[in-house]
Amino acid sequence: MAKHLFTSESVSEGHPDKIADQISDAVLDAILEQDPKARVACETYVKTGMVMVGGEITTSAWVDIEELTRETVREIGYVHSDMGFDANSCAVLNTIGKQSPDINQGVDKADPKEQGAGDQGIMFGYACNETEVLMPAPITYAHRLMERQAKVRKDGTLPWLRPDAKSQVTFQYEQGKIVGIDAVVLSTQHCDSISTPDLREAVMEEIIKPVLPSEWLNKETKYFINPTGRFVIGGPMGDCGLTGRKIIVDTYGGAARHGGGAFSGKDPSKVDRSAAYAARYVAKNIVAAGMADRCEIQLSYAIGVADPTSIMVETFGTEKVSHDIIIEAVRQFFDLRPYGLQEMLNLLQPIYKKTAAYGHFGREEFPWEATDKAALLREFAGIK
């Protein structure tokens, strides 16, 4: 594969599925603030004029679900009926129940260190040295375009923008290295008064150019800005939204495998979330240590069992030390039991709402992005 193209997409915080993710994680954070040992599995559905919050929650905390939901939608920017969705007037339905005692008996143990996994499943983590945050470039820059869209919308630079938007970036590779950007797609909701030519010029100048490195852009790069020409009806009025429906956007943009489990609304006892974060942490430290240029970790668990049922390390032929050394380092320096990874990454804190838009990985504010084990791994592997 001497030459190839690779594409990843992102969506804005105002995309219906991301509204749902943010509400679910806002509920999780509010509960963890009061009760760090709570069991939370919160799902959200949004559609024109309505939000439904459901799931299974066992906690001593009390949270005003309706007000929390409205505040989350308000922060995103849906504050007027002209946008098709209004935080102040939408209906909020609460259908939350309690976690099954059959699950509790497998997770909760007398010795917290032996806490079992909340479910069976497979989780993947990935890192590569393609960007400074050790993430694939296509998803990294797709997210940054969406972050920029939100910034210029909220600070008044482009006041006619609305919250719903999507981006997609296609990178050109030769011999596995980036040589340019082949195509950029950006669709953004807007008010009715802006013309398509004015919108396209403003998006190019205020969103695309400030984000994408000029050395990767050339006269052959193709731009598709609101290619249908009109995007006034958006958000929950245009499409219904559901928690957990943007799992590739949330992770590696398709550049790595995915176990299928979503993240938002789940407390750290759910290994769908916590073990995926731990797998990213392991992979990132391996790459940061110089043990490999690319690394993918797979973990698997059985419900009620503490130790992973399997650990897989894949370095795609880019390893700089023996594969056996890398595997031994993972086993020796990373505690991948549910309790161990919660402690290792300090996961029992209200940090999850911020993860629910613009990706869970490649953002240094999150503990699973630390490379604090890299020096230890280098020493173990004898890397100078």
From Swiss-Prot:
L-methionine binds at residues 56, 99, 239, 270. It catalyses: L-methionine + ATP + H2O = S-adenosyl-L-methionine + phosphate + diphosphate. ATP binds at residues 15, 164-166, 230-231, 239, 245-246, 262, 266. Residues 99-109 are annotated as: Flexible loop. It is an enzyme of class 2 (transferase). Its main location: cytoplasm. One of its GO terms (biological process) is S-adenosylmethionine biosynthetic process. Transmembrane segments: none annotated. Its cofactor is Mg(2+); K(+). PROSITE patterns: ADOMET_SYNTHASE_1, ADOMET_SYNTHASE_2. Binds 2 divalent ions per subunit. Its EC number is 2.5.1.6. Mg(2+) binds at residue 17. Keywords: ATP-binding, Cytoplasm, Magnesium, Metal-binding, Nucleotide-binding, One-carbon metabolism, Potassium, Transferase. Pathway: Amino-acid biosynthesis; S-adenosyl-L-methionine biosynthesis; S-adenosyl-L-methionine from L-methionine: step 1/1. K(+) binds at residue 43. Homotetramer; dimer of dimers. Catalyzes the formation of S-adenosylmethionine (AdoMet) from methionine and ATP. The overall synthetic reaction is composed of two sequential steps, AdoMet formation and the subsequent tripolyphosphate hydrolysis which occurs prior to release of AdoMet from the enzyme. Belongs to the AdoMet synthase family. NCBIfam families: metK (TIGR01034). This is S-adenosylmethionine synthase. It comes from Vibrio vulnificus (strain YJ016). The lineage of its organism: Bacteria, Pseudomonadati, Pseudomonadota, Gammaproteobacteria, Vibrionales. The gene is metK.
